[in-house]
Amino acid sequence: MILLRLISWPYARKHLLRCLLTMAGIVLGVGVFVGMRTANKSVMAAFNQTIDRIAGAAQLQVTAGDAGFDEDILDKIRQIPEVQAAAPVIEATISTGQNNLLVLGVDMLGDRNIRNYDLEGSEDAIDDPLVFLAQPDSLMVTKKFAEERKLAVNSKLPMRTMQGDQVFTVRGIMKPGGLASAFGGDLAVMDIYAAQKMFGRGPKFDRIDIALQEGTSLDDATRKVQTLLGAGFQVEPPSSRGQQFESTSRMYALASNITSMFALFIGMFIIYNTFAIAVTERRSEIGILRALGATRGQIRTLFLAESAVSGLVGTAVGVAFGILLARAMAGYIGGLLTDIYGVAQTQGDLTLDPLLIGLAVAMGLATSLMAAVIPARSAAGVDPVKALQKGGFQSLGVGENRARRRWALAFGVGALVAFAFGSHGFVTYVGFVLAVLAAVLLSPAMAYWLARALRPIWARLRPVEGALAADSLIQSPRRTSGTIAALMLSLALVISLGGLARASYDSLAEWMRIALNPDFFVTTAESLSSRSFVFPGSLADGLRAIEGVDEVQPVRSVRVLVKDAPIMVIALDVAFVSRRIKLPAVEGNADEMYRLAAEEKGVIVSENFARLHDAHMGEVLEIPAPGSILRLPIVGVVNDFSDQQGTLLLNRGLFLRYWHDDSVNVFRVYITPGADAAQVRQRILTAFGSQQRLFVLTNREVRDFITRLTDQWFGLTNVQTAVAVLVAILGIVNALTVSITDRRRELGVLQAVGGLRNQIRHTIWLEAIAIGIIGVVLGLALGAVQLYYSVEIARRDLVGIGIAYSYPFQTALVLIPVILGAAFLASLGPAESAVRGSLIEALEYE
C-alpha cells in the first residue's frame, strides 16, 4: 500500500493522459457489453411489462395464432365451473403520426372483472357500460396520451379505419398507473364490437382472458379449458406471450450477444496491451526498486494493485458509458423489432440488471488483473541490471517465440480439424475460437516479418527516417505486438460483418427479383410487417374490376405455433402464384412441389424453417388451426426471406376451410401490359381509399422498405468500424508514446549530430503508418477466415439460409485509408512530444 501511494500515485498524476488511455480499453469493452445487453433486456422488459399490465387479473389466456377465432368460443369457456370471468379482447396498434397507439377492444359488460379502469372524475358513459356500448365511437385514453395531444373528455380523435376515416369521441381519461401505464402510456380502450369493424376482424376475437375461481389449480384449469376447446388453441398464462416474442426475436438477441461479446474480447485485448505497455515502460523503475531491495513479490503486487485500481475506475466509467449507450440503443432496437416482426414496441425505462452490472465489474477487474499478471511477472523476474538497460526488454526471446508458435500451431491444427467436422454447431464455435487464438499468438511473428518486408520500401521513400521507423518495429516487437493484435481483431470483425452483410444483400436481392414482381402491393398500412388491420376477401373482386388491372393475388399471413415456435403461415392461391413466380427449390423438384401444394397435398417450407427447426422433406407437420390440426407433409424447401423464424406456404383453400377466415393482409396486383401504372394506382385509391384504410405501394417502395430494414439490421457494422478506428488511435498513441520514451536517448543523439526536427517527426509518422499497414494486412487476412465462420454460424444458428461466401472488397478498400489516416492522426501528438523534449535530458536519460 505504501509503494502504491509513494510510487504509483505520483506516476499516475504525472502521466494522467496515459493512464486515461490505459483505462479507455476497459471503458470501451465494459461499456459495449453493458450497453448492448441492457438495451436488449430493456426492450424485452418493456414488452413483458405491457403484457402484465394489460392482463390485469387474468390467469390464463386463450389464443389461436394471429388469425383469432370465432365468437362462440367465449360461451364455451364461460360454462366451465372453474372460470370466474372470461373477457374477449382485440389488440392492435395504429400509428398516430407521432408514435404507435395500442388499442384494446374489450367487452365492457364483463371486462371489469379482469381489468380496472381508474378514471378521472365520474363519467356516466363509462360508469354505465350499456351507455358506452350504445355509442360505438366511444374511446378511453390514458392521461399521458391526452396531455400530449391536448385532449379532454368529449374531445374528438380522428382515425383511419377499415370503415374509412372516422372520428372517435374521448369518453374517459384513465389515471396514471396500472393499465394506463402499459405500452408507455400510449393506450386506448374501445368497445370490442366497434374494434372488430375498425380493424376489419369480422366476428372474431384475438384472445380470451380468463380469471379463475379462488383456490382453483392453474394446471387443472388449463387442462380443462384445453380439453374443451380441442387442438389448435393455446391455453397459457399471460407471461407466455413474452416468451413467444423472445423466441421470435431470438435471432437479433443472439446476433447482438455475439457482437457484444467479441467487442468485449477486443476491449480485453486493449486492456492487456495498455497494461503491458505501462509495465514495460517502467522497467527501469522496477530495476531501481529491485536494486534497493524490493522483492519479486512486492514488484508483482505493486503492479497488480495498480491494475486493480485502474480496472475498478475504468469499469465504473464503462458501466456508466454502457448505460448511456443503452438509452440510445433501446429505442433503435425497439423500432427495428417493430418493423421486422410487426410487434409494436415502446421505449420504457432502462432495466438495470444487478447481476449484469456485477458481472461487468467482475469481468473488468479480472481482465485488468489478468492483463497485468504476465508483464508484471516478466518485469519482476528480470535481473536488475537488465531492467536498467534499454531496448533488450522490448525484443521477444527465442524461447518465448517458440512457445508462441507451438501453441499457435496446435490451435491452428485444432481449427482445421473443426473445419473438417464443421457440421456440428458446437464444433464450429470451437474452430472459430481456436482460429482467433492462433492468429493472436502468431501476430508478433507476422508483424516482425511484415516490418522486415516494409523496411526497404520505407528506406527508399525516406532513407533515414524510413529505416529508423522500420528498425524500431523490427528490434522491439513487444512494444507494438499488442496494438497490432487488437487492431487485427477489430478489423477482422468489421470484415466478417461486412462480408455477411454483402452476402445477405446479394441473396435478398435475388429473392426480391423473383418473389416481389407485382406492380403494386395493396396493404392496410405503410409497412408490410403490420398485421393490425385486414381486408375482407371480397375486395379482390373490386380490385380486379379496376381498369388496367390484369391479375390480383390475395395473400394471408398469420403466425402460429409450429414445433414450439411462432412460424409465419402464408396462404395464397399456389396455382395462380406459381405461374408468375417460382422460387427455385433448395430441396425437391420445383414443378412437383408447386403442383402438390396447389392440390393441397403438402406444404412448402422455407430453408430457414427447415434448418432452424430441424425439418426435412417428407416430414408431416402439425399446423394448429382453431379447433383442429392441419397435417401436411413437406413437399419442397425454398429460399424465402419473408420471416426470420421461417415460413410455411400453403394453398388458400386450406386456410379458408381450417381457419374459417377469408381476410387478406396484402393483395399482389399486376397491371395489364401497356397500362399507365400511375393512373391505375390512382384509380384504386379513388375507388377504395375513402371507403376503408388502404395503401397502394409500388414495387420500388416495397423493395426500398425491405432494404432499409436490412440496412438497420447491419447498422452494427458501422459501430464496429468506429470501434476499430478507436482501437487504432488508442493503441498507436500508446505504442508511440512508449517508443519515444524508450528511444529518448536515441532520438536525442540523432538531434545532437544534426538531425532535424522534421526528420524526427517523419520517423514517428512513418512508424505509426507502418503499424497501421501491418494491422490492416493481418486484419484483412484474419477477416477472411472469420467471415467463413460467421457465414456458417449465420446459416446454422441465425438466419438458417445458405449464404454464399463473399469477401467485402469494398469494405476493405474503405478501411485501408480510414485506418492509415487514423494512424497518422494518432502519431501527431507523440511526434510533437518527441521533438519538443529537452535534448539535455534525453542525453542524460541513462
Language-model features, listed with the residues they occupy:
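Interfacial "coupling" helices/loops that link adjacent transmembrane helices in transporter permeases
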Residues: 15, 245, 269-311, 391, ...
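Small-residue-rich transmembrane alpha-helices
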Residues: 275, 309-342, 355-381, 410-423, ...
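Short cytosolic juxtamembrane segments of multi-pass membrane proteins
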Residues: 381-397, 833-846
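Hydrophobic, regular-secondary-structure patches
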Residues: 19, 23-108, 126-135, 147, ...
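Short beta-strand boundary microenvironments
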Residues: 101-147, 529, 537-546, 550-617, ...
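Peri-transmembrane interface segments
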Residues: 47, 227-265, 280, 302, ...
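Alpha-helical transmembrane segments, especially those used as permease/efflux helices
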Residues: 2, 13, 17-21, 254, ...
